[in-house]
A protein has these predicted regions:
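N-terminal maturation segment of proteins
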Residues: 1-410
Length: 410
C-alpha cells in the first residue's frame, strides 16, 4: 500500500509535494532520484533479512504491487515515468537550461534509475515472491501477535483488545444495517438488505458520469456548495486552497481516495485525490460524505489549519491516526446540519461509509488476530456491505498491508 519508488516517480508530475517550477527545483528532484538506487539496494538487503527470519509479505500484496514496479522499468527514456518532469518543463527556462536538464535526466534514467528499477523488479518477482506467505494476517509472522497488539494501541490510543474491538465491530455492523433497512423500506424493495445495497450501487441514475472530468466537475460543484455553508459552522478557515484531482494512473490500481496536505510555506495547495478507474461506474451517492471526510471540513481543515497556527513543529506536522480520522468522521456527520443528507440517496451513501468503518473493526481484527484468510475477509465485506469483489479485494489488501490503521475510523 504505497511505496517510495512509485511515489518518487509520481513527483515528476510537479503536482505533488515536489515542486517543479524552477531550475533549482529540477536539480533538487534529480538529486532525490539519484538516491533511489541506494534505497533500493538497502530495501533488497532488508527483504532478504526478512526472508531469513520469516518476516515476509503475503503473496497477494506483492502480486498486486508488481505492475507498478514493472512500470518503472520502461526502457524508452522518453516513455519512462521518471521523464515526466522533462515533458512538463516550464517554457520560461532558457534553451540552454532545458537542454542541460534534459541531458542530465536522460543520463540518470539510463545509468541509474532504469538499472535499479529492473533490479528491484527482478528481485521481487524471482527471489522474493516465491518466499512470500500464504497467510494474510500479521500474527502469522514471528512475534506478530504482540506486534499487532502494539499497533492496535498505537492507532486507536485505547487499551481495547483486538477481541473487544472485534465484538464492537459486529455490534456496530448490526446497528447500521438496521438503519439502512429503514431506508430500504421506503423503496419498497423486496429482497435482502445486501441485495438492496447491490441494487442501489448498480442503478444507472447514480452513475451519471462519462469521463474523469465529469467526476472532478461534480466534486467541484460539491466543494462550492459546502464552502458556502462552512462559515455558519466555523469561525476560521484555512488559507491554503484545496484542489481536486484524479489519482494518477500509475497508482490507481492499488490506491484509495486520500488527501495530501499543503506546503507549510503556502507554495502548494491541499489536494483531494479520488480514484476513478472507470467513470461510468463511479457512484455519486457516496461523494458527499467522502468529500466531507477527505476534503473540507475534514482532512483539509485539520491539516491546513494545524500548519497555519503558531504551534511547535511537532504539533504542526504530527499525525495521530485516531485524532485525524476521528475529526474526519466528525466532519462527515456535519452533512446533516448542512442539509446535505436530506436526499435519502445521499444519506444512504453516508450510512454506507459508516458501515464500512464498522466492517473495518471486524475485518482488521479478523485478519490479524483471528487468522482470517484474504478470501474470508472479502466475503464478509461482500455479504455485509454489498460491495463487488474488486472493491473487497482492494480494501482487504489495504488492511493486510497496514495492520491496525483501519481501526482508527470508529
Amino acid at each position: 500500500y504505497g511505496g517510495l519508488p512509485v511515489s518518487l516517480a509520481q513527483f515528476g508530475t510537479g503536482q505533488d509535494i515536489q515542486p517543479l517550477k524552477t531550475v533549482k527545483n529540477y536539480e533538487n528532484y534529480l538529486k532525490r532520484l539519484n538516491k533511489l538506487p541506494v534505497w533500493i539496494d538497502q530495501a533488497i538487503t532488508n527483504m532478504r533479512e526478512g526472508i531469513k527470519r520469516g518476516v515476509v509479505q503475503p503473496t497477494p500484496l506483492i502480486v498486486s504491487g508488481l505492475p507498478a514496479i514493472k512500470a518503472l522499468t520502461e526502457a524508452d527514456v522518453e516513455k519512462s515515468v521518471f521523464y515526466l518532469a522533462i515533458k512538463s518543463m516550464p517554457s520560461t527556462f532558457s534553451k540552454a537550461e532545458q537542454a542541460r536538464l534534459t541531458a542530465a535526466y536522460t543520463q540518470s534514467i539510463k545509468s541509474r534509475l532504469l538499472p535499479a528499477s529492473i533490479k528491484l523488479y527482478t528481485f521481487l518477482e524471482q527471489e522474493y515472491l516465491p518466499k512470500t506467505r500464504a497467510s494474510a494476517g500479521v500474527s502469522a509472522i514471528p512475534d506478530g501477535a504482540a506486534w499487532y497488539k502494539y499497533l492496535v494501541r498505537f492507532h486507536t490510543t485505547t487499551g481495547m483488545t483486538p477481541e473487544e474491538i472485534h465484538a464492537l465491530g459486529l455490534k456496530e455492523v448490526a446497528r447500521i444495517r438496521g438503519e439502512m433497512a429503514k431506508i430500504q423500506a421506503g423503496y419498497k424493495f423486496e429482497g435482502s438488505l445486501t441485495d438492496f445495497l447491490k441494487w442501489h450501487d448498480n442503478e444507472a441514475q447514480f452513475r451519471p458520469f462519462k469521463t474523469d472530468q465529469d467526476v472532478l466537475d461534480a466534486y467541484g460543484v460539491l466543494n462550492k456548495t459546502i464552502a458556502a455553508k462552512l462559515p455558519q459552522l466555523f469561525g476560521r478557515a484555512p488559507k491554503a486552497p484545496l484542489e481536486i484531482r484524479a489519482e494518477p494512473e500509475l497508482t490507481r490500481a492499488t490506491a484509495s481516495d486520500h488527501y495530501s496536505g499543503p506546503a507549510a510555506d503556502g507554495s502548494r495547495p491541499g489536494v483531494f485525490y479520488t480514484v476513478i478507474e472507470d467513470p461510468a461506474k463511479y457512484r455519486n451517492t457516496g461523494m458527499t460524505t467522502l468529500f466531507l471526510h477527505e476534503g473540507q471540513p475534514g482532512h483539509h481543515y485539520h491539516t491546513a489549519l494545524q500548519q497555519e497556527l503558531p504551534l511547535p513543529k511537532f504539533r504542526k506536522f504530527g499525525w495521530i491516526t485516531a485524532y485525524g480520522e476521528g475529526w474526519a468522521l466528525y466532519a462527515e456527520t456535519l452533512g446533516r446540519e448542512m442539509g446535505l443528507y436530506d436526499d435519502p440517496n445521499q444519506y444512504l451513501g453516508h450510512l454506507k461509509d459508516e458501515l464500512l468503518r464498522a466492517v473495518r473493526l471486524v475485518t482488521d481484527t479478523g485478519l490479524h488476530s483471528k487468522n482470517w484468510t484474504r478470501e474470508q475477509t472479502m466475503q464478509y465485506m461482500m455479504d455485509n456491505e454489498g460491495v463487488i469483489e474488486s472493491e473487497a479485494r482492494r480494501a482487504t489488501e489495504r488492511y493486510m498491508a497496514w495492520p491496525g490503521q483501519a481501526l482508527a475510523y470508529k
